[in-house]
Swiss-Prot record:
Catalytic activity: acetate + ATP = acetyl phosphate + ADP
Compartments in which it is found: Cytoplasm
Organism: Agathobacter rectalis (strain ATCC 33656 / DSM 3377 / JCM 17463 / KCTC 5835 / VPI 0990) (Eubacterium rectale)
Lineage per the UniProt record: Bacteria, Bacillati, Bacillota, Clostridia, Lachnospirales
PROSITE patterns tied to this protein: ACETATE_KINASE_1, ACETATE_KINASE_2
GO CC aspect terms: cytoplasm
Binding-site list for ATP: K14, H207, L208, G209, N210, G211, D282, F283, R284, G330, I331, G332, E333, N334
Site note Transition state stabilizer, residues: H179, R240
Classification via HAMAP family: Acetate_kinase
SUPFAM superfamilies given in the database record: Actin-like ATPase domain
CC cofactor: Mg(2+); Mn(2+)
Residue positions binding Mg(2+): N7, E384
UniProt GO MF annotations: acetate kinase activity; ATP binding; magnesium ion binding
EC number: 2.7.2.1
Name the record gives this protein: Acetate kinase
Length: 397
């Protein structure tokens, strides 16, 4: 069957049309500047990208343009919309309500809306995308796949904060975690690639991109993850601070005369390796600056790598051991010198890295540890769109 995968942001929309039988991407692209002037990028498999500038007042017009491109007589991937069998939607926050993917109903949409406070930038946009698809494809089944769902297997000791319990009872303040679709996909792929039994394994997944998180996956189930109530907790990221002393917020607010929104803007958008280095949130730029001897870039890379290694060590303790570590996402898949820095801290686990293989591995599945390493270390490219496609087929196929 053909599954249209939609990832809807506040002013953008990414899409892929995937044949679930062959798992081939038939077409992909994105809509940008929705609500402003509008720009559609469309690419059929095997052809060059096409870019169309056109007004997109709302997501409905954006999705209509995507559908028109998919059935275009010359460059379309399908002859008619009847060949699109299902739509899989990325939904960022499912709170405690959703521990798995679901077929979208009015009740599901209402429950997602109840989680809007937990993801005010993302959930409303996700719902807008769902509504737009329903209006344009009323008879096509829709599935919601949640970033938070995979982490719902965490035990209470991992998700509760040391705050008054009433905040959990009243407001559901707890660790939720994100990138769950990626962590789930990569842990399964890693077990398969390494010939392990997923249901009898201890795998740590390091999803290292502009947003970054680590998860502990015990016997196929997440038991801990580094992001929290929001994606701000945990690792140092591209522009996010990660873990800090909460009192820093009050200290900076007084010194810089900022309100709470101003402080949160600093922590979310002006911190991380970009804020530390003054160079960029992009590790390609950071690596170049690092190699040129830029002291702030060196410090940013060292702090980033050290924090990842600390979390991996913590999760090895949480699971009382580790069988495999899987690196994924933009930095995890492509930045070999950062992988090597992280692994250098973990020799006590018996990890030995094959430097030659590590250095040449970019964006492909690879075993980067040596044959005598106690823990297998690998690179597994993430594919959240394919994961959403598989989840959709599982429910409506």
């Amino acid at each position: 069957m053909n599954v249209l995968v939609i990832n809807c942001g506040s002013s953008s929309l990414k899409y892929q049309l995937i044949n679930s039988d062959s798992e081939e991407v038939l077409a992909k692209g994105l809509c940008e500047r929705i609500g402003i002037d509008g720009r559609l990028v469309y690419q059929k498999e095997g052809l060059d990208k096409e870019i169309t500038e056109a007004p997109m007042p709302t997501h409905k017009e954006a999705i209509q343009m995507v559908l028109d491109a998919l059935v275009n007589p010359k460059t379309g991937a399908v002859k008619s919309l009847a060949e699109i069998d299902a739509v899989g939607h990325r939904v960022v926050h499912g709170g405690e309500k959703f521990s798995d993917s679901v077929v979208i109903t009015e009740e599901v949409i209402a429950q997602v809306e109840e989680c809007n406070d937990l993801a005010p930038l993302h959930n409303p946009a996700n719902i807008i995308g769902i509504r737009a698809c329903q209006a344009l494809m009323p008879n096509v089944p829709m599935v919601g796949v949640f970033d938070t769902a995979f982490h719902q297997t965490m035990p209470e000791k991992a998700y509760l904060y040391g705050l008054p319990y009433e905040y959990y009872e009243k407001y559901k303040v707890r660790r939720y975690g994100f990138h769950g679709t990626s962590h789930s996909f990569v842990s399964k792929e890693a077990a398969s690639y390494l010939g392990m039994d997923l249901n009898n394994s201890k795998i740590i997944v390091a999803h290292l991109g502009n947003g970054a998180s680590v998860s502990a996956v015990l016997n196929g189930k997440c038991v801990d993850t580094s992001m929290g109530l929001t994606p701000l907790e945990g690792l140092v990221m591209g522009t996010r601070s990660g873990d800090i002393d909460p009192s820093i917020m009050e200290f900076i607010a007084k010194k810089e005369n900022l309100d709470i929104d101003g402080v949160m803007n600093v922590l979310n958008k002006k911190s991380g390796v970009a804020g530390m280095s003054g160079v960029s949130s992009d590790f390609r730029d950071l690596e170049a600056a690092y190699n040129e001897g830029n002291e702030r870039a060196i410090a940013a890379v060292e702090v980033f790598s050290y924090r990842v290694a600390k979390y991996i060590g913590a999760y090895a303790a949480a699971m009382n051991g580790v069988d495999a570590i899987a690196f994924t996402a933009g930095i995890g898949e492509n930045t070999s010198f950062v992988r090597e820095k992280i692994m250098a801290y973990l020799g006590y686990l018996g990890i030995k890295i094959d430097r030659v293989t590590n250095d040449k591995t970019r964006g492909v599945e690879a075993l980067i540890s040596t044959a005598d390493s106690s823990v297998k270390v690998c690179v597994i490219p993430t594919n959240e769109e394919l994961a959403i496609c598989r989840e959709t087929v599982k429910l409506v196929g």
